[in-house]
């Protein structure tokens, strides 16, 4: 399932990320339950003061709201049943501490009915094993937004890398977007058609135009994610881009061609890797380098006069 902070993650990847987040928040008080037991008990881990945790990321990338709700609802039902069945074994793990809350941690949810389902399951738990849980026991729905501080800490500590959003647009989607961003497309096309290698070949010119436009649109998705989830890192990337932009503008004044453009992109990517390779995965940095070229071409810094 797609996450805002780490792009597309498998169920196992999400579990690994969650365990790091739990360790960051609860320190040594958080204990992982080995998978061969956790799968049977309906918990990923626990704390000694009575918090239980379960992580869940559905396999597919795109869901309707109804489908996502049904998957998450059924997972909660299944694991709460395991919790009820194995409560005595779970109590052995956390020194017979009564259970305070059960945390269901998923990348996102978008249906209020999931809250209602949790309230029903809380009543079932109180009826079935009320002597082993607190009177105010709750099923807590949590997403990555519940752990923003921990995500920032782990990224800055270089324990986790920021992943690409992996957002990719089809040709039809690009055509549709270009209708609202027509000025950008026209600027890119106007500059590219000054090149001898492109101006005589309309088909190739169109392909290059939409390739650069793709770099721009998909790169903007990456920047939006960074600005929202990692504002400090976004500011650092922006400062680097602005400093390189001045050099690019000077090179453009002396005249550049497609080979020069490729060299500028590689040099910028190298600068990105020097400063951010420990905290950003390489595909994200590649997308940012491509976005910069497209952005500079859509504005003023790069021209082929």
What function would you assign to each model-found segment?
Residues 1-98:
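Short, surface-exposed loop/strand segments
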Residues 4, 9, 29-35, 139, ...:
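Generic preference for hydrophobic/aromatic residues in regular secondary structure cores
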Residues 68-253:
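Acidic metal-coordinating catalytic centers involved in nucleic-acid phosphodiester chemistry
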Residues 225-305:
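Extended, amphipathic alpha-helical scaffolds
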């Amino acid at each position: 399932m797609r996450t805002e902070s780490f792009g597309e993650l498998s169920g196992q990847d999400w579990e690994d990320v969650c365990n790091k987040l739990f360790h960051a928040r609860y320190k040594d008080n958080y204990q992982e339950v080995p998978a061969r037991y956790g799968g049977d008990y309906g918990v990923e881990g626990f704390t000694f003061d009575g918090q239980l945790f379960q992580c869940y990321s559905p396999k597919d990338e795109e869901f309707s709201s109804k489908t996502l709700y049904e998957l998450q609802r059924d997972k909660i039902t299944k694991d709460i049943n395991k919790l009820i069945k194995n409560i005595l074994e779970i109590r052995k793990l956390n020194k017979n501490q009564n259970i305070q809350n059960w945390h269901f941690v998923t990348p996102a949810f978008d249906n209020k009915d999931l809250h209602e389902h949790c309230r029903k399951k809380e009543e079932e738990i109180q009826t079935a094993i009320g002597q082993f849980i607190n009177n105010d026991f709750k099923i807590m729905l949590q997403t990555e937004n519940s752990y923003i501080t921990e995500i920032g800490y782990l990224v800055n500590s270089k324990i986790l890398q920021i992943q690409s959003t992996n957002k990719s647009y089809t040709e039809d989607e690009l055509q549709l977007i270009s209708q609202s961003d027509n000025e950008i497309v026209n600027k890119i096309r106007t500059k590219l058609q000054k090149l001898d290698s492109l101006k005589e070949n309309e088909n190739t010119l169109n392909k290059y135009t939409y390739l650069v436009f793709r770099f721009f649109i998909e790169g903007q998705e990456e920047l939006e994610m960074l600005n929202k989830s990692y504002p400090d890192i976004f500011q650092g990337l922006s400062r680097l881009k602005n400093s390189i932009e001045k050099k690019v503008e000077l090179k453009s004044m002396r005249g550049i061609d497609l080979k020069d453009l490729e060299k500028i992109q590689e040099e910028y990517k190298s600068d990105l890797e020097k400063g951010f390779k420990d905290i950003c995965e390489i595909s994200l940095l590649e997308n940012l380098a491509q976005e910069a070229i497209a952005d500079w071409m859509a504005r003023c810094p790069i021209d082929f006069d």
